[in-house]
Swiss-Prot record:
Motif LIR 3, residue range(s) on this chain: 429-443
Enzyme active site: 176, 197, 258
Motif (LIR 1): 9-23
Mutation effect (residue 343 to A): Strongly reduced binding to phosphatidylinositol 3-monophosphate (PI3P)
Listed name of the protein: Cysteine protease RavZ
Function: Cysteine protease effector that inhibits host cell autophagy by targeting lipid-conjugated ATG8 family proteins on pre-autophagosomal structures. Specifically hydrolyzes the amide bond between the C-terminal glycine residue and an adjacent aromatic residue in ATG8 proteins conjugated to phosphatidylethanolamine (PE), producing an ATG8 protein that cannot be reconjugated by host ATG7 and ATG3. Mechanistically, Ravz interacts with ATG8 proteins conjugated to PE via its LIR motifs, extracts them from the membrane of autophagosomes and integrates the PE part into its own lipid-binding site.
UniProt entry keywords in alphabetical sequence: Host cytoplasmic vesicle, Host membrane, Hydrolase, Membrane, Protease, Secreted, Thiol protease, Virulence
GO process annotations (BP): protein delipidation; proteolysis; symbiont-mediated suppression of host autophagy
GO CC annotations on file: extracellular region; host cell cytoplasmic vesicle membrane; host intracellular membrane-bounded organelle; membrane
Length: 502
């Protein structure tokens, strides 16, 4: 999708053009869908706002404020690499609008994490002749509220606020997700701002690119400093040095994962503040994709965005009560529905059918599983025939990206397989309806059995044949012949084991 980017667009692409890249390349980045209004906005209805599964999303496809807020649910998930429960507890009161409050378990540090908001935007002018830029009214208001809170605070505090910075002339760059933190020391009455940025600054490539493109500014540091100074103007606070802690990640022009790096850094800042240690992030200029945002981090992020169906009210309870949000069966159903909807819109890739399953096969299997899960959710019994059909579709359901979706939910629902998830709800038939029909002539066609034949079959000598056993065999034949005679009168007797005689 091509179009002009504005401060209201929700795209968070994480790169300024490298040396040699043309400004028009910005159009290659797709705009993401608009955000829902988040808590703290009067328009929000917490009871109905939902962040649904996005089963086709990947970590490099970009972040928006809705996705970032959804990821906050991982902070008190004990199975997540982003778990904060060992470092902080939640504050019962909510002294700051739009922020979650935490108390360090190891010192008196208080930490306030603001919810992501699409209106937290700052713009910078790239040329030296213009003023520094602008800060969105809502972001400016949050800075004033932080200043007001600190005027009454007696404990050290750290404020964490994700925001988007962008050039006022969008042809000179792109929107970029960064993280603003402000540390407050009540003894010295000093506020110290820091911006964490996933684009390496002060590198040779960055400086050379800015020089040739005539960029006097490439960040919002100057306008943010001015805004913070304005917020504390009527106080006796001092402002510490504004610092931008920048680090690199790989393939910045093609990876839209600055939002994922921001989320990773939120966790790092909270844990470090709670422990009273320095925030440890990679240095500027280093390629750090796999060492900082590890494969486990990426998996947790993608699984949350792709497979979970979470409401704003759920995330609020997790962050205000410090509890894990268990995966529900209903989330499994919604994720499958999203997968089915997207898969039905895709064209058939026949070249892959030799090694995988066709589009039709996947959709059929998904529809079957959705129906079964809905029955389980409604506490209805699953028929034996439904179960048999599911067993036949298991391999298809566990294939490729669909298999990852299914495996995620099975693991979180505590089931080793689809069969074990469904089996407790299956009602098996108590009676056998399908009889085996045998012709009566075949039933009574009993060959003569001689001692010699039995002996030869057994591989024993004729003299060792048990005469009593031979007599029993003959008696059986006699009894069967008697039954045959009775049948001539028209009497038909069913035999044991569900076998009946014609």
């Amino acid at each position: 999708m091509k179009g002009k980017l504005t401060g209201k667009d929700k795209l968070i692409v994480d790169e300024f053009e490298e040396l040699g890249e043309q400004e028009s390349d910005i159009d290659e980045f797709d705009l993401l869908e608009g955000d829902e209004k988040l808590p703290g906005d009067s328009e929000l209805d917490k009871t109905t706002s939902i962040y649904p599964p996005e089963t086709s999303w990947e970590v490099n496809k970009g972040m928006n404020s809705s996705r970032l807020h959804k990821l906050y649910s991982l902070f008190f998930d004990k199975s997540s690499a982003f778990y904060l429960g060992d470092d902080v507890s939640v504050l019962e009161d909510k002294p700051l609008t739009g922020a979650y409050g935490f108390q360090s378990k190891k010192n008196d540090q208080q930490i306030f994490l603001f919810r992501p908001d699409s209106d937290y935007v700052a713009g910078y002018h790239v040329d030296a002749k213009s003023d520094a830029g602008w800060v969105n009214d809502k972001l400016d208001r949050r800075l004033s509220e932080i200043s007001e809170f600190c005027s009454k605070a007696t404990q050290p505090a750290t404020f964490i606020l994700p925001f988007v910075e962008m050039p006022t002339d969008i042809t000179k760059g792109v929107q970029h997700q960064v993280l603003l933190t402000i540390s407050y020391d009540p003894k010295s009455k000093q506020l110290t701002p820091t911006v964490y940025d996933s684009i390496g600054r002060d590198t040779y490539s960055e400086s050379l690119s800015s020089y040739f493109k005539g960029k006097y500014r490439t960040t919002c540091d100057e306008i943010l400093t001015q805004s913070i100074e304005k917020a504390i103007k009527s106080t006796d606070f001092t402002l510490g040095k504004f610092t931008r802690a920048a680090y690199n990640h790989q393939n910045r022009l093609t990876e839209g994962n600055c939002g994922s790096y921001t989320f990773r850094t939120i966790k790092e800042v909270i844990s470090s503040s709670a422990q009273g240690t320095e925030v440890k992030i990679p240095g500027s200029g280093y390629i750090t994709s796999n060492s900082y945002l590890t494969s486990q981090h990426v998996q947790d992020i993608e699984s949350c965005i792709k497979y979970r169906n979470l409401g704003v009210v759920d995330i609020e309870s997790a962050l205000t009560e410090g509890k894990t949000l268990p995966v529900q069966l209903s989330e499994f159903i919604v994720a499958l529905e999203d997968y089915g909807k997207l898969r039905s819109q895709q064209s058939e890739k026949s070249m892959l059918n030799f090694i995988g399953y066709s589009k039709t096969a996947k959709l059929t299997a998904v529809e079957l599983l959705i129906g079964i899960l809905n029955d389980i959710k409604g506490k209805n019994e699953i028929s034996e025939s439904q179960y048999d059909k599911l067993v036949k579709e298991v391999d298809c359901l566990m294939d490729s990206s669909l298999g990852k979706l299914v495996q995620f939910h099975l693991k979180n629902l505590g089931a080793e397989s689809l069969q074990k998830l469904v089996l407790p709800c299956v009602k098996f038939d108590d009676t056998i309806d399908d009889f085996v029909t045998i012709e009566k002539d075949e039933l009574f066609d009993v060959p003569d059995i001689t001692g010699e034949e039995l002996a030869s079959k057994k591989g024993i000598e004729q003299g060792a044949l048990d005469k009593e056993a031979l007599l029993k065999q003959k008696q059986i034949k006699t009894d069967l012949l008697d039954l045959r005679e009775e049948d001539k009168t028209g009497l038909k007797k069913p035999l044991h084991g569900g076998i009946k005689v014609k």
